[in-house]
């Protein structure tokens, strides 16, 4: 039986559990550890980077799916990019979208040190702009999408993504717990938590999609087309 402490919003037991999970699985690759350190030292928002456990889940999902076309919305310093690259098909392409070009020097420093880095294609701009201009005839249908961009626009991103997915395409949405504040009598309100609640409800009610929320990081929702 699952302990009820796992369902509490109090971060004490949850953080203990996350630390246990992170230290019980495969260790963080050296390149990613170096990028993690650089992110904390050279940016003001290191907390936006995926934790070690989430990164290993992204890498494992990518290895299972073996996408020929992968898409990441919200590159930040490129940590998740390198995790997804680990499982990319040898002939695949990983598209990643970031609007803040001040982060590009970190990409350019660390990505070339990864095997297969030449298959990363960086888009400078807004997530929705890339989705709206995506041409499946030239870029291909998307086998795996990792969504970690503008939370207020996450539902529009979902609707734009769905017709671009391959027949058995996967989507992963980050931060779908929003620090455990989306439910209960003191649930957070505002554009971002409201958008995430709407996303969770939308995914749950769609019979064409199979959805599971993983207790990873700040909540990682995996979605697969039936």
Predicted features by range, described:
Residues 1-172, 176-226:
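A short alpha-helical cap/connector motif
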């Amino acid at each position: 039986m699952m302990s009820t402490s796992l369902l509490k919003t109090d971060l004490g037991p949850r953080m203990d559990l996350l630390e246990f999970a992170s230290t019980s699985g495969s260790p963080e690759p050296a390149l990613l550890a170096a990028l993690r350190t650089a992110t904390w030292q050279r940016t003001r928002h290191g907390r936006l980077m995926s934790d070690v456990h989430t990164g290993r889940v992204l890498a494992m999902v990518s290895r299972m799916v073996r996408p020929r076309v992968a898409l990441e919305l919200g590159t930040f310093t490129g940590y998740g990019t390198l995790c997804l690259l680990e499982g990319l098909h040898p002939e695949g392409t990983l598209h990643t979208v970031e609007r803040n070009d001040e982060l590009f020097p970190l990409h350019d420093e660390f990505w070339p040190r990864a095997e297969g880095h030449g298959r990363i294609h960086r888009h400078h701009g807004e997530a929705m702009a890339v989705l709206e201009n995506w041409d499946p005839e030239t870029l291909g249908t998307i086998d795996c999408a990792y969504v970690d961009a503008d939370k207020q626009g996450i539902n529009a991103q979902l609707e734009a993504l769905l017709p671009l997915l391959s027949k058995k395409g996967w989507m992963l949405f980050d931060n779908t717990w929003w620090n455990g504040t989306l439910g209960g009598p003191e649930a957070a309100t505002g554009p971002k938590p409201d958008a995430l609640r709407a996303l969770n409800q939308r995914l749950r009610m769609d019979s064409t999609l199979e959805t599971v929320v993983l207790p990873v990081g700040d909540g990682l929702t995996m979605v697969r087309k039936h």
